[in-house]
Amino acid sequence: MHLFKGAMTDSERIPVIIGVGQINDRPEDPDNGLDPLGLMVEALKRAEADTGVTLLKKLDSIAVVDQISFRHLNPLDAKLAEALGATPAVCYQSDAPHGDTPIRLLNEAANRIGAGEIKLAAIAGAEALRTIAGRLAKHATPQQDVFEGVRNEAKREPGYAQQHGLNAPVDVYPLYENA
C-alpha cells in the first residue's frame, strides 16, 4: 500500500511515496482471517503510521486493485473510503486483477498529483485466497467441490494487453525490463 502527497505549486507537484504498509494475515483458524477489505484497511493504517502523521481521512484519491478471493464484496473502493473515514474526489477499482495493475494505479496517481488534480492518494490491493480456501475447506459439504471464492462469473471484454496476448506476468515483465 502506498500513500502519495503533492502540493499546490509546480515545483512541489513532484509525487513522493510517503508511507507504505503491508500485512500478511495467517491465522490458524480461517474464520479469524481478514477479508480483502480488512487487509487493505490494516495495510493503509500501517502506511499512515509509517508517515508519522494522520492522513487517511484527508485522501483525495483511492485506487483499489480488483480482487478475486471475496468477489461478493466488490467493488471495494467506496467501502474502503468509508472504512477509512475518507471522502476522496477520485475513488475507483481496477477492472481486473493483473500483475501490472498496482504499478498502473501508482502511475495514474502520480500523474494526477503532477497535474495538480489531487494532493494525497492511496493505492491498495489485497487477496485473501488462503482465508477463503481455509473457510471453504472447514465448512465444506460433500456437494461442494468448486472453489467458489475465485469463480468469476462476470464477463469482461479483453483489455489492451490481453488483445495482444499479454495474459500472464511472464508475458508482461519483459516489457518492464526493456522499457
Regions found by a protein language model. Give the residues of each.
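Conserved phosphate-binding catalytic cores of ATP/NTP-utilizing and phosphoryl-transfer enzymes
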Residues: 103-111
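Conserved "HGTGT" condensation-loop signature of ketosynthase/thiolase-family condensing enzymes
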Residues: 2-96, 110-115, 122-179
